[in-house]
Amino acid sequence: MLKIKKPKITARKAGTIGLGVAGYIARWVFILAISYILLYPLFYMISVSVKAPTDFVDTTVIWVPKNFSFHNISKAFKALDYVKSFGNTAMVEIVSALIEVGSCAVTAYGLARFDFKEKKILMFILILTILVPLPMIITPLAVRMRYLDVFGILGLIGEVIGVDIRPNLLNTPWSFYIPSIFAVGLKAGLFTYMYVQFFKGLPKELEEAASIDGAGPLKTFLTIVVPSSGTIFLTVTIFSVIWHWNDTYLSTMFLSKDYPLSVNLARILNADIGSKYDAKTVGIIMAGCLLVILPMLIMYCVLQRQFIKSIDRVGIVG
C-alpha cells in the first residue's frame, strides 16, 4: 500500500502564504473603498432623482424609493431649458473642444519634430500656460474679446477715422473658437504638452521616408503621424470635451445669454430653488446634475475600452 506523504508547510512558507492572503484582502478593501468614494455621489444622485415627494419625508426610504417618479427629472428638464441649452453646449463647447484637439496637435508636432532658436522659449511659455491659473488672465482675455485687435492696427485705424471698428466677440461662439484655433483655449497648454511627449516617442523612419518621397511637413503629419497617433487623439478628445462641457468660468465671462448646460445648472443652484435646498428642491437639483452629466457618462461608457487602451499607450510612449 502506497503511503502519500503530506507536504510539510514550514513556518516560513506559512508566513509567505499569510502575507499573500493579507495583501490580496488589503488590495480588494482598497479597491472597494475607492469605488465607494467615486460611485456614491452618482448612486445618490440617481436615487434622489427618481424619488417621489412623499419618499423624502419617509424615514424608511434610504436608497430604493417606494414610489418611483420622474417628477424631479421633468422639473429639472424644464428649468434647464434642456433642449436649447444642449444645442448651445454643442455649438459652443463641443465645437471648440474638437477644434482645440486639432490645433494643439499641429502645434505640438512642430515643437516635437523641428528645431529652431525660439523652441525653448516657446516650451517655457507652454509650461507657463499650464501653471498660471485661468482667473489671473480672464480679465485681459475678456477685454481682448470685447475689443478684438491685431497688433493695434484696427484701433489705430479707428482713431484716424473716428469710428471704433474693433469687433465685439462677446456673446458669440467666436470668443471660444478663436482661442481654440490658435491652440490657446481651455487647457490647451496641457493638451499640447501631452501631444509633444507622445510625438517624441514615435519612430522617425516613416516620416523620413515620406520626406524623401517629396511629402512636406503638413502632408507627413496628416498621412503618417495622425494615423499612428489614434490613442493620444482619443485621450485628448475625451479630456477636452469633458473640460469644455463642465466649464462655467469662461462661459459666464464671455456670454450673457444662450448659456450652455453647465451655466444654467449653476444658475439653478444659485437661484431661489438652490438657496432653499429643502426636501422638495433637493430632488430637482440632483435631477438637474444627472441630466447635465448624462451625455458624458454615455460617451465614457461607449469609449471606455478604447480610452483605457489609449491611456496605457500614452503612458508607455509619452
Where are these regions (language model features)?
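Short, Lys/Arg-rich, polar N-terminal cytosolic tail immediately upstream
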Residues: 1-18
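A structural signal for multi-pass alpha-helical bundles of membrane permease subunits
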Residues: 4, 23-318
